[in-house]
Swiss-Prot record:
GTP binds at residues 372-377, 489, 537-538. Belongs to the TRAFAC class TrmE-Era-EngA-EngB-Septin-like GTPase superfamily. AIG1/Toc34/Toc159-like paraseptin GTPase family. TOC159 subfamily. Residues 269-280 have a biased composition (Low complexity). The gene is TOC108. One of its GO terms (biological process) is protein targeting to chloroplast. The chain crosses the membrane at residues 969-989. This is Translocase of chloroplast 108, chloroplastic.
Length: 994
């Protein structure tokens, strides 16, 4: 072996002196395989810079034969002969030209058992090496594979040592591998899209490094194993000498440039992600914080004596991982696969180093329950000392108090409350106590709520439902979303079952738990709730284990289990706040109450409705909502009625003497004169109204007061209460008609109170389920205002509607309408403040702008609207409006278009046609609807037709006819009756029943 070393050294010196291109070949002890015959890969590089690398390695000791095992010495000659033959072939090759120098290639040579040489395929080599690591049945999968998502070779990463303490190869092997890594980096820059090939290369390099580490525990490319589990192989380091910045900037990616000395320059790519965005950095920070939460929870479980395989621990860890993936979409190959192992290892390491250290964790617990169930005794059992006074004969806790202590180095803060009474007559007492609790917890919201009850209570009904509903009404339904049911006296003997045999303990606990959980669901109004149940036994005679911990009949140690449930809830709340999966709890709102998004489409529809402006009492006579428009369209034609010739009405006897044609002509003439007379009266009313406005504008306040006094002195007749007509009640099975009970009078009082009739009510019911109150008044003789309210209550629900409005005129053609509304939406009251201003742009154009704000369930929804009304001629009116409403980060957009075509003699003829189109966009869901309505006279019959259709394909068509002469129209009602009889006889569709 010494002679072989001398020959190899002499040949290398000769090649260096001749300055020729020779392959650099260094063989380590791992290049020689054992008798198992496994394939070994030897990489040989051809480079013009070989002289420099050789000159640096002349002083290094030879590796061949230095640590060769005895059983391999016989095969060394064969291996050395093959290497020498290959070197001679390479040295005999002519010197490459400049063109060939610009595109050098690395030749990989495989030495097989027989000593022959063959060219190796890089993809096959990488595949075999990766399979050798991952598929070996004796090797436990190592976390090293997780590094493939990152850059495999990084100069900033520390070299991980193998189990025997070796740093990897010698400096010669490290330099050789650095050249190979540089060439690999150039290839990666040339083809960045081939991510799979890069990952395979990184894995192969890690495997080759592990094989060259000299670890006797594995042959070739297997990572080291030890008592602590698999360890990562040593990562190859980057070369110490880097390419100058100027040279790096001048070289284009994927193209080789020639240095002045003729050596080939290699493009070196940075392995650190310098162009990482702020989102990625924030995601890494979030994952790190979440990992700290995992470590904290595992430390909590370890201190409570619970293993990671505990059901509660495993479920919490699973939820943390699921929440992380949903929030950030983190790749499982980066943190998901081994985050638990790392967290568990860190938790065990920190606990081993600091067992007595107090954790940076505190939990606040609120206890609620009936008196005498054992709340204070449980608090004493948790802290293993007397923190609260207890008594077996009377309530011992008289006020809300706070108990603070440490359990296994964990700070626990318990809010002890007085006991509640289950009787319905004691609800006032319970409300007073819970009012104190609600005031106390405003300072610091509790993390978990423990509701106490006894396991040995033999009640299978909902006797505690009034008490639980009182808790729900005061704290909200969200108090049960983060509550744990605690059943005390858990060592009680199970009662006898229906067959006289005692129930099993599991069945006893399940039945009692089901009753309490079902009662909570009824009180919260959510049948999906599933509160966890924990059993507690505080009696001194309770069975204990060797460590003195109290054990239940089912073998469970109740104290760690109860604390683990409390801590798990706090941990999940911290993770939820970190990942922002749900909206955070607002200050002063305990138990994580979440405000609901208001019904924006409903509120937007109410905002877009056109509202009539209020007017003074002397302006309201004979006016309608469209009176302002009618005032501006006074007909300029002469009054045709005064120019008509005299007309004498005929008596009944004279009509009978006329023929049919004469009678028809007479009726037409009479109808025309009646129509023209009504038109004359309508014009006179408009003219009188305009004159009154002008006169009122010219008169001063004193003159108005004198005019009112003169009217009072004129001796107007006093208003006499007049009974209002009875309302038409629906048919009833009752013998007597109860209308006499609800008669009311129309008095001179400004307050108008009327009953509200529900025509579609219950049988054997009067039909009156509410009342309505209205009042119109004037503020400071200029501002008309109105107040109206309605309250309805039936057997299921109650509704309240209140509206207050006032109009303020501030200039010619400018009116502002303000209002305050209260209405019932679901089970909540919505308070709305609105204001809109209408002004005249032109003679036939009016524009309205309005704002609104609605307060509903601790949420404010605000919106704006814009409306424009245009008159085209005397018959066509266009109304266009649009608005937007926002609340709780949500928005709804809407608008409508309405075109109205009036008859020639409207409003006398009552001929009117309306075409409407509405659009609303909410959450990207576009709703489009159209409706058409037309009413006209056919002789003396009023015909009304309606049709509507939306973009979802649903619509409705209705036709209504009303006449006082065509009584035969009543026969149409026979059609549905006949259809029902036919269906009952022959079945639906006319088919006979089988």
């Amino acid at each position: 072996m010494a002679e072989l070393e001398k020959l190899a050294a002499a040949r290398l010196e000769k090649e260096a002196s001749n300055n020729t291109v020779n392959p650099v070949r260094e063989v380590s002890e791992d290049d020689v395989k054992d008798v198992s015959g496994e394939t070994t890969v030897v990489t040989t590089s051809i480079s013009e810079g070989a002289n420099e690398s050789l000159s640096k390695k002349e002083d290094e000791p030879a590796l061949i034969g230095s640590n060769v095992p005895e059983e391999l010495e016989g095969n060394s000659l064969e291996v050395q002969s093959a290497i020498t033959t290959d070197l001679e072939k390479v040295s005999s090759t002519p010197t490459p030209s400049n063109a060939e120098k610009e595109s050098p290639e690395a030749t990989e040579v495989r030495i097989v058992e027989e000593g022959k040489l063959e060219k190796a395929d890089p993809s096959v080599v990488n595949e075999e090496l990766s399979k050798e690591i991952l598929e070996d049945p004796e090797v436990v999968p190592s976390p090293a594979k997780m590094y493939t998502a990152l850059k495999a070779v990084d100069g900033d990463m520390p070299v991980l040592k193998s189990e025997n303490g070796n740093d990897g190869d010698t400096d010669a092997n490290t330099a050789d591998e650095d050249n190979e890594n540089d060439e690999d980096d150039v290839d990666e820059d040339e083809d960045e899209d081939d991510a799979d090939m890069d990952t395979a290369k990184a894995l192969a390099e890690l495997a080759m490094t592990a094989g060259k580490s000299g670890n006797p525990a594995f042959s070739g490319t297997k990572p080291s194993m030890g008592a602590a589990g698999p360890s990562l192989p040593s990562l190859p380091q980057r070369p110490a000498v880097r390419k100058p910045i100027a040279a790096t900037a001048s070289d284009s990616p994927g193209r080789n440039t020639q240095r002045p000395n003729g050596a080939l320059s290699t493009q070196i790519t940075s392995t650190t992600d310098e162009s990482a965005s702020s989102d990625a950095a924030e995601g890494d920070e979030t994952r790190e914080k979440l990992q700290n939460i995992r470590v904290k929870f595992l430390r909590l479980a370890h201190r409570l004596g619970q293993s990671p395989q505990n059901v509660v621990v495993a479920q919490v860890l699973y939820r943390l991982g699921l929440a992380e993936s949903l929030r950030g979409g983190s790749a499982p190959n980066r943190s998901g696969a081994f985050s638990f192992d790392r967290a568990n290892a860190l938790a065990e390491e920190q606990e081993a180093a600091n067992q007595e250290e107090e954790l940076d964790f505190a939990c606040t617990i609120l206890v609620l329950g009936k008196t005498g169930v054992g709340k204070s005794s449980t608090i004493n059992s948790i802290f293993d000392e007397r923190k609260s006074v207890t008594s077996a004969f009377k309530p011992s806790t008289n006020k809300v108090q706070e108990v603070i202590g440490t359990v296994h180095g964990i700070k626990v803060r318990v809010i002890d409350t007085p006991g509640l009474l289950p009787s319905v007559a004691d609800q006032q007492h319970n409300e007073r106590i819970m009012g104190q609790v609600k005031k106390y917890i405003k300072k610091a919201s509790p993390d978990i709520v423990l509701y106490f009850d006894r396991l040995d209570m033999q009640s299978r009904d909902f006797g505690d439902l009034p008490l639980l509903r009182t808790i729900t009404d005061l704290f909200g339904a969200a108090v049960w979303f983060n509550a744990i049911v605690v059943l005390t006296h858990a060592s009680s003997a199970p009662p006898d079952g229906p067959n006289g045999v005692p129930l099993s303990y599991e069945m006893f606990v399940a039945q009692r738990s089901h009753v309490v959980q079902q009662t909570i669901r009824q009180a919260a109004g959510d049948m999906r709730l599933m509160n966890p149940v924990s059993l507690v036994e505080n009696h001194p005679a309770c069975r204990t284990n060797r460590t003195g911990q109290r054990v239940l009949p089912n073998g469970q140690i109740w104290k760690p289990q109860l604390l683990l449930l409390c801590f798990a809830s706090k941990i999940l709340a911290e993770a939820n706040s970190l990942l922002k999966l749900q909206e955070t709890t607002a200050p002063g709102r305990p138990f994580g109450q979440r405000s609901r998004v208001p019904p924006l489409p409903f509120l937007l529809s109410s905002l877009l409705q056109s509202r009539a402006q209020l007017k003074l009492p002397d302006e309201q006579a004979g006016e309608s909502d469209e009176s302002d428009d009618d005032e501006e369209e006074e007909d300029s034609d002469a009054d045709d009625y005064d120019e008509l010739p005299p007309f004498r009405p005929l008596s009944k006897e004279e009509l009978e003497d006329l023929t049919k044609e004469q009678r028809e002509d007479y009726m037409e003439e009479l109808a025309d004169r009646e129509r023209m007379f009504q038109k004359k009266q309508y014009r006179e009313e408009i003219r009188r109204r305009k004159e009154a406005k002008k006169r009122q504008a010219q008169m001063s306040k004193e003159e108005l007061a004198e005019a009112e006094e003169a009217e009072d002195e004129a001796g107007n007749a006093a208003a006499v209460p007049v009974p209002m007509p009875d309302m038409a009640l629906p048919p009833s099975f009752d013998s007597d008609n109860p209308t006499h009970r609800y008669r009311y009078l129309e008095t001179a009082n400004q307050w108008l109170v009327r009953p509200v009739l529900e025509t579609h009510g219950w049988d054997h019911d009067a039909g009156y389920d509410g009342f309505n109150v209205e009042k119109m008044f004037v503020v400071k003789e200029k501002i008309p205002a109105s107040v109206s309210g309605q309250v309805t209550k039936d057997k299921k629900e109650a509704q309240v509607n209140f509206e207050a409005a006032a109009s303020l005129r501030h200039g010619e053609g400018k009116v502002t309408l303000t209002g305050f509304d209260v209405q019932t939406i679901g089970k909540d009251l919505a308070y709305t403040v609105r204001a809109e201003t209408r002004f005249n742009n032109f003679k036939r154009n009016k524009t309205t702008a309005g704002v609104t704000a609605t307060y509903l369930n601790d949420t404010i929804a605000a919106g704006v609207k814009l409306e424009d009304r245009v008159l085209i001629g005397k018959r066509v009116k266009l109304v266009v409006n649009g608005g937007v409403l926002t609340g709780k980060g949500d928005k709804a957009y809407g608008g409508s278009l309405e075109a109205t075509l009036r008859g020639k003699e409207y409003p006398l003829s009552r001929t009117l046609s309306t075409l409407g189109l509405s659009v609303m966009d909410w959450h990207g869901d576009l709703a489009i609807g159209g409706n058409l309505q037309s009413q006209f006279m056919v002789g003396k019959t009023m015909m009304v037709g309606r049709a509507n259709l939306n973009n979802r394909g649903s619509g409705q068509v209705s036709i209504r006819a009303s006449s006082s002469e065509q009584l035969q129209m009543v026969l149409i009602g026979i059609v549905p009756i006949l259809r029902s009889l036919i269906n009952c006889r022959f079945g639906f569709g006319g088919q006979s029943q089988q």
